[in-house]
Amino acid sequence: MSLLVKICGLSTRETLETALDAGADMVGFVFFPPSPRHLSLELGRDLGRQVNRRALKVALTVDADDATLDNIMDALSPDIFQLHGKETVARLRDIKQRFGRPVMKAVPVATSADLAVLPGYAAVADRILFDARAPKDATRPGGLGAPFDWHLLENLDLNLPYMVSGGLHADNVAEALRITRAGGVDVSSGVESAPGVKDPEMIKAFIRAARATQDASQELSVR
C-alpha cells in the first residue's frame, strides 16, 4: 500500500502548487479562525479549483456546525473532512450521512489512555489521524509543532487506515514511520518558516524524505 503524504494548512497558490508538483497525495485547508492557517471561503474556493483533482482536498474543521460545513462544502467541495475537535461518534456519523464524504478523525495523544476512544471512532471514521495532544492553554488543537511518543502506537491493533502528525519534519519523518508503521504522514508547522507561512523548499524536502522511507521499506520487503 502506498504511503500517503499530506501537506496541511496551505494558504497560497505558490505553496499549493509546490505541494502538488512535489507529489503530495492530500492537501489540507484549514477553516478555523484561531489558526494562522485559516482560509476564507473565497480563498478556499480559489485554491480548491487550483488542485484540479491532482490530490485529495481535505477540509480541516474544529467542532464546526452544519451551516459552517455547508459553506465549506459549497466553496471547496472537499474529498475528505478532517475533524480536529471534540466531535462525538454520533457527530461523525451525522456528517458522513449529510455530506456523503469520508471523515478522518484526529485523535490527540499524550498517553496510552488517549487511545481508549479508538473503538468508538473506528466504527464510523474512514481514517484516524494521530496528533500530539495540545497543552490545556492552547487556542487550537493542532499545528503546534510538538510530537507525541510514537512508541504508544508501536503495538497498535487498528483495523482502519491511520496517519500520524504532530511535530513532523524532514529529519524525523523516517523515524516516525518506522516506529508507528502508519500508512500516511501529515505535516503543517514542520514545513513552515513562521506560523502559517509555508516554505516551498521545506515542503519538497519533507515529501522527498517521506518517499525515500517508503522506497527503502519496499526494497527491504522484496529481498
Swiss-Prot record:
Belongs to the TrpF family. NCBIfam families: PRK01222.1-1 (NF002295). It catalyses: N-(5-phospho-beta-D-ribosyl)anthranilate = 1-(2-carboxyphenylamino)-1-deoxy-D-ribulose 5-phosphate. Its EC number is 5.3.1.24. Pfam families: PRAI. InterPro entries: Aldolase_TIM (IPR013785), PRAI_dom (IPR001240), RibuloseP-bd_barrel (IPR011060), TrpF_fam (IPR044643). Keywords: Amino-acid biosynthesis, Aromatic amino acid biosynthesis, Isomerase, Tryptophan biosynthesis. This is N-(5'-phosphoribosyl)anthranilate isomerase. GO terms for biological process: L-tryptophan biosynthetic process. Pathway: Amino-acid biosynthesis; L-tryptophan biosynthesis; L-tryptophan from chorismate: step 3/5. The keyword Isomerase applies. The gene is trpF. One of its GO terms (molecular function) is phosphoribosylanthranilate isomerase activity.
